[in-house]
Amino acid sequence: MNAPAEPAELSTPVAVRRLDGMLPPEGGEAGIRATLDAGAQHVFIGEDALLDGALVEKLVTEYGSGRIGLHVPVRRMQVSWSMDIDSNADFRVMTPSVCEPCWEILRADGTRSGTHAAWWIGEMFRLGATDALIQADIEDDADLNILAGLTERWGDRLWLAPLNETNPDLESWVNLGGAARLAVPDALYQNSPYLTALRSAPETGASNEDIG
C-alpha cells in the first residue's frame, strides 16, 4: 500500500466520522421513533426497513426525509448455476444466478437476505430516505468495482464503513472506489495516518455531527 496521501494530494474532499452513534437504535420501530422523538436529527434504519418495506415511507412522512437514512450491511452475493434448456433447444448451457458481482444485504444476525443491495437502496431513496450507511469489507477488485458503481450513482449520499475488517484499505476505498464519506470505529479514527490526512483536508457535504 502506498504512503498515506497528504491533504494537498487529495483530489476530492472526504468526510470522516466515527461509526459509533450512527448505527440503528435498538427496539425496532418503537426504538426508532423514541430516538427521533428525543430529538435525534438523523437516524439510520436497518433490518426493520428490510422487513417492512413501508416503514421508510411512513417515517419520512411523519418526520421528514432529511432525518431518515438506511443502514445496509452487505457481503458479496453468492453465485449459483443452473441449466438453461429453454433459450436454445439445440444447446444446454449453465447460467449464473447473477450476471456480474454485486452485494446483498445481510440481516442483523449476519445471515444473507438474498436482497440485492443496489436495487433496495434505490427503492428506499425513491421512498424518501436521504442517505445510506453501507458496511462492507472490500476484499478485492470486484468489491471496489461494486463500490465505484454505487458512488458513481449516488455520490455523497453514501457513507461507507467496514463490516468486520479491522484494518481496511481506506485509501483504495477513496481513490479507486470513489468513497466520499467514511464512518469508522473509534480506534481506526484515532490511529490511522491516512484518516488524519483526510480530516485535515477541506470537507464538502453535510456535516454528520448531529447524526443519531
Segments predicted by a language model, with ranges:
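Short, acidic/polar
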Residues: 28-35, 113-123, 168-171
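Glycine-enriched alpha-helix->loop->beta-strand junction motifs that scaffold or abut catalytic
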Residues: 34-43, 62-68, 126-131, 150-157, ...
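Short, glycine/charged-enriched secondary-structure capping and boundary segments
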Residues: 58-59, 83-86, 147-149, 173-176, ...
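Phosphate-binding glycine-rich loops and adjacent basic patches that engage nucleotide phosphates
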Residues: 19-23, 109-114, 134-136
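Alpha-helix-loop-beta-strand connector modules within alpha/beta enzyme cores
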Residues: 6-26, 55-74, 140-169, 202-212
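Extended amphipathic secondary-structure runs
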Residues: 116-152
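Conserved anion-binding
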Residues: 38-130, 202-212
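Glycine-rich phosphate-binding active-site loops on the catalytic face of alpha/beta enzymes
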Residues: 1-8, 31-32, 38-55, 133-141, ...
